[in-house]
């Protein structure tokens, strides 16, 4: 027999130890049922524990009709429903439910269920978790196939979080920390709070469970998210992709995957579609084995390759992003291509996994069926100009990776092209992995022209030698103060006493850059020779120059002036010749 009490404006505290609780929308408040007794018009429904230990009783919130609004406060609740194979708290119905967090709350559900469960359907309402007083926390653990917060197994999920200190995980496998259980789509919106989410085996930290996709928008809060094997930290679960938007003032402290999933993006064998904008900040994103830090997951089969489609814009900052072995820092997983756009007042620091590009393709990628390779655009706009530091992935003897990745472009053992576009004002430092290029693909350093004043491109080989092309824009000359000379000078023709000749022995012009005690000479040829007498070098040494660097398109050599001066008399000629990637030095006609 069900007993109903009718009362005006009732504010009730309900103790979970007294029995299961069901809450629905009434005419002017909540209808709360416990032990077959219903109280109506409850305007401040608070659910709590009378004692410290966990209760196995559950809470069901049913905003049944489309216009229903149900608001419930969880205050120091501790529910463990794992023995009942039920959800500790479940939210259903076509209407909207808001859960306020007060105090410390713990929810643990049984197999097949989420810790705090909301299964999304075509007609379901919205679940919002909030912490208006900034004094609430929630620890939620799902059972086998269920998310920590989100859906049960084989269901889609919808969750919106606006605040609270929230820790979400699964006590078993296949579910996301926040998002969907297995085989579902996790639709997650986070606008605030301090979030720590860990996926179960094959589940994303935030996004999709096993075989589940992620549809994630984060516009605020501080986030730490870890995906388990095959799943992204933020994004897709095992065997599924993701659409991830990080914007506003969101801070991603760390997003990572143990293996095969991107830090942010796709799960194993899946693409990652990621947009980072506004004032968002990524402090660290790390891809699992074979996956990108931001972008595509690892290769699974010929028809399941993790490509990375990434846009970074506005004032976004990427402090550190690291690809897993074979994966790009930003772009494709192993065998995966990239479509990356970086624009505006952005700052990016990216490193490729062993064999992967820092920004671009994963190792072993091929052009797609339309014969398109990696597409990379870096440009300024009305918001400002980008600053990029890109370090190509190195080698790994244990993985038999003997060639590194490009700083910007293609990964190792890749036949994929790299269509790289630079527009406006850019500041780029790119370091090549072993036997790869700093910026480009297929062994060719790409040249650029028409960039705006103030642009800078600096290229390094893996040993840190400057291999900047003579055609690259150089850093702006520091302005002097107090009438003193600047620290660096640029001369667009020749430096007195130093002659550069082409392959036919004809004199050609070059660019000379003096910075402190180093004189750099740059020429846009594959083959060229630098010629100088020891008398000229002695004069340079008297002016404070102790090192001369000679740079052609694919080769850079540094010479010690003191060592050369010890090799002969004043009239002795020094000739340094570059041909493609090789160099040869003679002093007085003798090879050194």
What residue spans do the PLM features occupy?
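Bacterial N-terminal signal peptides
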Residues: 1-4
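A composition-driven surface/loop motif
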Residues: 7-480
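Long, contiguous ectodomains of secretory-pathway proteins
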Residues: 46-49, 69-75, 80-84, 92, ...
């Amino acid at each position: 027999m069900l007993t109903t009490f009718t009362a005006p404006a009732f504010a009730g505290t309900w103790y979970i130890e007294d029995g299961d609780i069901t809450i629905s929308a009434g005419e002017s408040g909540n209808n709360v049922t416990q032990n077959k007794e219903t109280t109506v018009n409850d305007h401040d429904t608070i659910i709590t524990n009378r004692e410290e230990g966990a209760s196995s009783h559950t809470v069901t919130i049913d905003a049944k009709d489309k216009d229903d609004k149900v608001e419930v406060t969880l205050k120091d609740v501790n529910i463990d429903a794992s023995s009942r194979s039920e959800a500790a708290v479940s939210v259903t119905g076509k209407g909207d439910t808001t859960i306020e967090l007060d105090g410390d709350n713990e929810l643990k559900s049984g197999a097949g269920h989420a810790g705090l469960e909301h299964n999304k359907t075509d007609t379901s309402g919205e679940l919002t978790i909030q912490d208006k007083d900034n004094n609430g926390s929630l620890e939620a653990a799902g059972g086998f196939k269920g998310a920590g917060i989100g859906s049960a197994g084989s269901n889609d999920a919808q969750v919106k979080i606006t605040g609270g200190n929230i820790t979400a995980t699964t006590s078993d496998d296949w579910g996301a920390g926040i998002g969907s259980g297995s085989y579902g789509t996790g639709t997650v919106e986070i606008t605030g709070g301090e979030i720590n989410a860990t996926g179960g085996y094959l589940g994303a930290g935030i996004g999709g469970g096993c075989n589940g996709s992620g549809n994630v928008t984060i516009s605020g809060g501080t986030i730490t998210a870890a995906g388990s094997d095959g799943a992204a930290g933020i994004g897709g679960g095992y065997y599924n992709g993701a659409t991830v938007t990080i914007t506003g003032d969101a801070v991603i402290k760390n997003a990572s995957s143990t293996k095969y999933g991107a830090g942010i993006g796709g799960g194993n064998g899946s693409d990652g579609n990621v947009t980072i904008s506004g004032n968002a900040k990524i402090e660290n994103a790390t891809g699992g084995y074979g996956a990108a830090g931001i972008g595509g997951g690892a290769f699974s089969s010929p028809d399941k390759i993790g490509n990375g489609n990434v846009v970074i814009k506005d004032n976004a900052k990427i402090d550190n992003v690291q690809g897993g072995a074979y994966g790009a820092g930003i772009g494709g997983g192993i065998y995966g291509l990239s479509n990356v756009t970086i624009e505006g007042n952005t700052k990016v620091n990216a490193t490729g996994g062993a064999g992967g590009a820092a920004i671009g393709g994963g190792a072993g990628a091929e052009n797609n069926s339309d014969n398109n390779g990696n597409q990379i655009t870096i440009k300024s706009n009305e918001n400002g100009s980008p600053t990029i530091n890109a370090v190509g992935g190195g080698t790994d003897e244990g993985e038999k990776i003997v060639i590194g990745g490009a700083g910007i472009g293609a990964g190792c053992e890749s036949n994929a092209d790299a269509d790289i576009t630079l527009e406006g004002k850019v500041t780029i430092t790119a370091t090549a992995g072993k036997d790869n290029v700093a910026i480009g693909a297929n062994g060719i350093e790409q040249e650029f022209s028409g960039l705006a004043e103030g642009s800078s491109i600096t290229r390094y080989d893996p040993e840190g030698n400057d291999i900047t092309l003579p055609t690259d824009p150089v850093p702006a000359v520091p302005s002097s103060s107090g009438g003193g000379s600047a620290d660096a000078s640029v001369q667009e023709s020749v430096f007195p006493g130093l002659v550069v000749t082409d392959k036919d022995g004809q004199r050609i012009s070059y660019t000379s850059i003096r910075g402190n005690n180093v004189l750099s000479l740059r020429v846009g040829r594959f083959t060229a020779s630098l010629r100088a007498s020891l008398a000229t070098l002695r004069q340079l040494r008297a002016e404070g120059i102790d090192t001369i660097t000679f740079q052609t398109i694919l080769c850079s050599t540094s010479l010690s002036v003191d060592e050369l001066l010890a090799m002969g008399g004043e009239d002795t000629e020094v000739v340094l010749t570059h041909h493609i990637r090789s160099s040869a030095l003679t002093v007085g006609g003798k090879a050194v």
